[in-house]
Amino acid sequence: KESVQSTGQITKAMKLVSSVKLQKAKVGAEVSKPYFDAMYEAVAAMIAKSGEMSHPFLQKSRSDKKAVILITSNRGLAGGYNSNAVKLLTKDERFTTENTVVYAVGTKGRDSVEREGYTIAGDYSEAINEPLYADASEIGKEVLSKFTMGEIGEIYLIYTIFKNTMVQIPTMMKLLPINASDITADAEDVEENPIDRITLMNYEPAPEEALNAIIPKYVNSLIFGGLVESHASENGARMQAMDSATSNAEEMISDLSLKYNRARQASITQELTEIIACLLYTSPSPRDKRQ
């Protein structure tokens, strides 16, 4: 009982810590999300309004290699948060240990996929402790360099979308090459704004230079968005897991207390029964008293 109480106190403390971290992470996600959405919508609209455009960022390179930026956590005790993100990679037949390299953000995911045989091309696990745009830029610079050199043909991002403390959604997003038809469909869903009324965009000096400037920022923004969302999701999942663990500990303590009290009551009853039996056995009978 004492060990369960001790565990319950630990999980309750972890729940409170995660709750504080979650509030901070939620603020960061809410403040940053409009920028990520605006960046995505700008690129979607730009490609949609540019007519036929040929650019390396819009076309698959000659390499069949795939790069996956996998965002998990450095700590466990977060329910299925880490395993659900890892499964998006390991259960997808498109990503084999031969054709996929992993850029790991988070030791839990890194260790899991490494055991599965995937190559870890980069380890940025410290970036998830406190998401910074500088860390996202560093990761983006590395994968973009490999893409432009033709060493990898596709770049994917696996992260977890934060909905609320009860719901976190593991998600895979393709970063490059940008699929013009898909992103054009997204552009059609963008709310009416001045850019939607433009039928065609002209670039000076050239569309290629415009994309060379904006696509790296686009990739970095999506990576940073993934870091921020995943950080909030991790703390939400951990808070929920610790809340469940605390409730289970309290339920177990209640059950153990009931069993303990019943056992104690049975023991006392047994002792009283034995005492009474002993007294009855040793006390003289009425016949003995008359004699």
Regions found by a protein language model. Give the residues of each.
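C-terminal beta-strand-loop-alpha-helix "lid" module of Rossmann-like NAD(P)-dependent dehydrogenases
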Residues: 1-283
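Single conserved hydrophobic/aromatic residue that forms the stacking wall/gate
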Residues: 281-291
